[in-house]
Design a protein with these regions (language model features):
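Extracellular/luminal ectodomains and secreted, surface-exposed scaffolds of diverse proteins
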Residues: 33-42, 219-221
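Secondary-structure capping and domain/repeat boundary segments
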Residues: 62, 132-134, 138-253
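Bacterial N-terminal signal peptides that target proteins for export
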Residues: 1-13
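Acidic, Ser/Thr
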Residues: 53-55, 79-94, 195-202
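Bacterial N-terminal signal peptides
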Residues: 11-22
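Structural signature of tandem-repeat unit edges
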Residues: 8, 37, 42-45, 57-74, ...
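N-terminal Sec signal peptide cleavage junction
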Residues: 24-27
Length: 253
């Protein structure tokens, strides 16, 4: 019996030592960056958004960046301490009564319930690709993609995904992401309220957003509006809104 207890004690000590060494090798730093609270682990070249700062809670629009301080943003939530795997957390501090829409620049994972305490959030825009999973939180919001990615992901029974109706183009050959810099979605007949961050291109200066590839007529975010809503009667005899794209093209100087 004593020998057995001794073995159990040794195993317990070894386990505790392993956990302590693991904790030491993965030292944690919690910092504020822009509108976000962020967690860094010294043993990983990644960053984890854990919540919003006080200023972040007052923003109507938020962009989830691809990188923070040179580290790829891989998750909204926590890292599993024991396995080191991603653990999207429903308890992350993403709380806001003001936030209306979230833009994902890259593929960052989370859960729909991550935003369950953002009572006014209605739209999530995926600039690159899908990166948020469904769960049983019962959060009601809509998800938007480029038309091409929407067609790939389209499910006739899914009432939450839509093609974005505002498409910002890099406007040069060989651009990444099929030439899309940004996408957005606003009601037809309305102004575009959110102006995306300025794109960058080596050797060039960004010169504004234009209505055609030749960059003749600049889009005025103060006065220009999207086309008026048009409807048609579908095969089931129901009225539905006709999808209309508004493409804006970057000018390079």
């Amino acid at each position: 019996m004593k020998r057995r207890l001794c073995k159990i004690l040794v195993a317990t000590i070894l386990m505790a030592t392993t956990l302590m060494l693991s904790a030491c090798s993965g030292c944690v730093r919690n910092e504020e960056w822009g509108y976000f609270t962020v967690k860094f682990y010294d043993d990983r070249e990644t960053a984890y958004i854990t919540g919003l700062t006080e200023e972040g809670q007052q923003q109507r629009f938020l962009v989830i960046p691809k990188e923070i301080k040179g580290r790829k943003v891989v998750c909204i939530g926590e890292r599993n301490f024991l396995t080191g795997r991603l653990l999207p957390s429903i308890s992350s501090e993403m709380k806001s009564d003001v936030l209306e829409r979230v833009y994902f620049e890259g593929i960052t994972y989370g859960l729909t319930s991550t935003f369950s305490e953002c009572s006014n959030l209605k739209k999530i825009i995926f600039i690159d690709d899908w990166g948020t999973g469904y769960d049983s939180a019962g959060v009601s919001m809509k998800y938007y993609f480029t038309p091409e990615k929407y067609r790939i992901k389209y499910n006739p029974y899914d009432t939450q995904t839509f093609p974005a109706n505002i498409l910002y183009r890099f406007n040069y050959e060989g651009a990444e992401n099929d030439g899309y810099y940004w996408i957005d979605d606003y009601d037809y007949g309305n102004r575009i309220e959110f102006i995306p961050p300025e794109p960058e291109r080596d050797g060039y200066t960004f010169g504004g957003w234009y209505k055609e590839p030749e960059c003749i007529n600049e889009w005025n975010f103060e006065t220009d509006v999207l086309p008026e809503k048009c409807t048609e009667i579908n095969e089931d005899g129901e009225e539905e809104v006709i999808y209309q794209e508004t493409k804006l093209y970057a000018k390079w100087i």
